[in-house]
Amino acid sequence: MKGGKRAQQPAKQNAHRLNGEIIGVKEVRLTGLDGESVGVVSLNEALDVALTAGVDLVEISPNAEPPVCRVMDYGKFLFEKAKAAKEQKKKQKQVQTKEIKFRPGTDIGDYQVKLRNLTGFLEEGNKVKVTIRFRGREMAHQNIGVDVLNRLKADTEEFAVVESFPTRIEGRQMIMVLAPKKK
């Protein structure tokens, strides 16, 4: 890459202190590999237990008296934690707002196609913003736009809830927001 230097990012600090990093304490409350409590032991004893097991001594709660340490494979622990966070993120559904535009003179065929798309969006769990756009002399017949919105409201009442219904026209359009019903 030509040009400037890339900024060096500092190495990530571990959230927990490991093996030789645990200093300033003489005794620790030790938890074994399978989660059972060993009791209060000296720091050197705890390090020996971790060394003989071939894993790490990890300081879990440094503020406790005495500090709580656990014998575990730290790399595996971090991997499991990252895997759990990834699973949690995957389960979290991102709700999007889709928009469908109508005109006061939208014919029945176009209306049916747009209604089918709208129901598809709602079944996916997305919110739908329905916009009625007015042009020219259509502004004088706003009641036709309200009729279209009421018809949509009636056609989608079994699987959608109206979040906001327009009380008046905003600029040259009316906007209604539909949300999927909770199952």
From Swiss-Prot:
SUPFAM superfamilies: Translation initiation factor IF3, C-terminal domain, Translation initiation factor IF3, N-terminal domain
Chief place where the protein resides: cytoplasm
Subcellular location: Cytoplasm
InterPro entries: T_IF-3_C_sf, T_IF-3_N_sf, Translation_initiation_fac3_CS, Translation_initiation_fac_3, Translation_initiation_fac_3_C, Translation_initiation_fac_3_N
Keywords: Cytoplasm, Initiation factor, Protein biosynthesis
This protein's record includes keyword Cytoplasm: yes
Entry annotated with the keyword Transport: no
GO process terms (BP): ribosome disassembly
One Pfam match: IF3_N
GO cellular component: cytosol; membrane
GO MF, any single term: ribosome binding
Signal sequence range: none
Function as written in the Swiss-Prot or TrEMBL entry: IF-3 binds to the 30S ribosomal subunit and shifts the equilibrium between 70S ribosomes and their 50S and 30S subunits in favor of the free subunits, thus enhancing the availability of 30S subunits on which protein synthesis initiation begins.
Quaternary state and interactors: Monomer.
NCBIfam families linked: infC (TIGR00168)
UniProt record similarity statement: Belongs to the IF-3 family.
Protein's UniProt name: Translation initiation factor IF-3
